Amino acid sequence: MRKYEIMYIIAPNLEESANKEIIERYNKVLTDNGAEILKVDEIGKKRLAYEINDFKDGFYVLLSVQANTEAINEFNRLIKINDNVIRVLVTKDEQ
């Protein structure tokens, strides 16, 4: 298993409870597929560098996980379907 860093941005027009639900849902997708979540950092609402889908702000979430490729692929597949997640980036952590 490799270490990955995942950052995704949730649309700012959602309630805090909806944000928590999205975070828990995608953490569960990872753990159900054999990943180990090392760290969850809810950075919070920040200004975007440029507008994405007419949003100027977004709720940032940063994950550090140890996972296999299948777990990451399933996470990517499911998170890209969700319209409330406006951007996602998965990178390998080489450390």
From Swiss-Prot:
Similarity comment: family membership: Belongs to the bacterial ribosomal protein bS6 family.
Keyword rRNA-binding among UniProt keywords: yes
HAMAP family in alphabetical order: Ribosomal_bS6
Keyword annotations from UniProtKB, A to Z: Ribonucleoprotein, Ribosomal protein, RNA-binding, rRNA-binding
Record PANTHER family: MITOCHONDRIAL 28S RIBOSOMAL PROTEIN S6, SMALL RIBOSOMAL SUBUNIT PROTEIN BS6M
GO biological process: translation
A cellular component term, taken from the record's GO annotations: ribosome
Molecular function terms, GO-annotated: small ribosomal subunit rRNA binding; structural constituent of ribosome
Entry-linked InterPro entries: Ribosomal_bS6, Ribosomal_bS6_CS, Ribosomal_bS6_sf, Ribosomal_S6_plastid/chlpt, Transl_elong_EF1B/ribsomal_bS6
Top-level division of the source organism's lineage: Bacteria
Known role: Binds together with bS18 to 16S ribosomal RNA.
Name of this protein: Small ribosomal subunit protein bS6
UniProt xrefs under Pfam families: Ribosomal_S6
